[in-house]
Amino acid sequence: METHQTVSDLVRRYFATYESKDRNAIEALLSDDFTFSSPLDDHIDKTVYFKRCWPNSQTIRSFRIEKLFEKGNEAFVRYEGERYDGGKFRCTEFFRIEGNKIKEVEVYFASLLTHANEEKAAKAGIK
């Protein structure tokens, strides 16, 4: 990656595909040797990712990126997600980019956002 803007753009486009439910668009963003890791998944490949993770896109209404830090071909993003049932959650993800494609995503689960947690965050000045 030559510019930071390109890394940010790929990360934002990745989340936008979940909002639009556009599997073709996300497939175009991922490298052939893409891997995905989370507390539930250990370096699964693209085929397993689409079987196990992509169906979750049907439950996602939106993402709100709170922080996005990048350096070279890597980025960390913290976001709040909202499901169609109104539930909210917050996660952090690490992205590694190679050749204008997303090569690796590592998800670090955080908390489900409840009304009580949102009130605590507001009092602490966190939006």
PLM feature segments, named:
Residues 1-24, 28, 32, 116-127:
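Short, low-complexity N-terminal intrinsically disordered segments enriched in polar/charged residues
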Residues 37-39, 50-127:
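A beta-strand edge to alpha-helix "cap/lid" segment located at domain peripheries
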Residues 42-44:
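Acidic-and-aromatic substrate-binding clefts and catalytic sites of carbohydrate-active enzymes
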Residues 12-16, 32-34, 47, 77, ...:
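Intrinsically disordered, low-complexity segments enriched in small/polar residues
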Residues 7, 46-47:
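Generic alpha-helical secondary structure
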